[in-house]
Amino acid sequence: LPIYNEILSRMEDSAVVPGNGRLAMTTDSFVVNPLFFPGGDIGKLSVCGTVNDLLMSGACPKYLTCGFILEEGADSGELEQIAASMAQTAREAGVTIVAGDTKVIEGKGGIYINTAGVGFVPEGLQIRASFCEEGDAVLVSGCLGDHHAAILSARMEITNSIVSDCAPLGEMVRSMQEAGVRIKAMRDVTRGGLATVLHEFAVAS
C-alpha cells in the first residue's frame, strides 16, 4: 500500500523514532458514512483530525499510528484509496505514519479507523483552556458547519456545492504564532460545535 515508508517497512512490533522536548499525545477513532464525501474521505479525515488535535495544544505533530477495523466484505479498492489519501495527507501535514494494524470483524463491509498521534511542544509554550479570560477574542478559521453539511449531503444524495473544509491546520497555526498573536487556547471544533467549545473554555477558566 502507498501508506508505507521507511519506518513502517521495518515491520517491528513498535516504532522507535527520534524526538526531543515535551511530548503531546492524542488518540481518536473515525466512523463516517459515507466513506468518501466532497472534499475528503475517512482516511484524510483521520489524519487531519489527529494532527489538528496535536496542533491545538501547541505541539508540532510528528508521528501517527493507524488501526483499521474492517467489516467482512470491505472493498479492497476503497481501502487502497483510503490508505493513499492518508499517505498524501500525512505528507502535506509533515507527519510520518510509523505503525499500523488491521482487524476484521463481522459486518457488512464497513471501514473504521483508529489513530494515535505524537508531537513535540516547544519549551516555554503553554496553551490551555484555563488561560482564557473575560474579554478575550474568539477567532474561527472558516465557515462553521461546512464539513458536516458536506457529509450529510453525500449521505442523503443531495446535490449542492458544499465541500468539507477538512485540512491540516499547521500552516494556519504557525502563521498566527509568527505574526505574534498571543494564543491562550485552541480547539478543533468537531461534532459538539462552537457552543460546546466555548462552554469548555468557560468551565475551564
Please give the residue ranges for each predicted region.
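Helix-biased detector of long, well-ordered alpha-helical tracts
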Residues: L1-S205
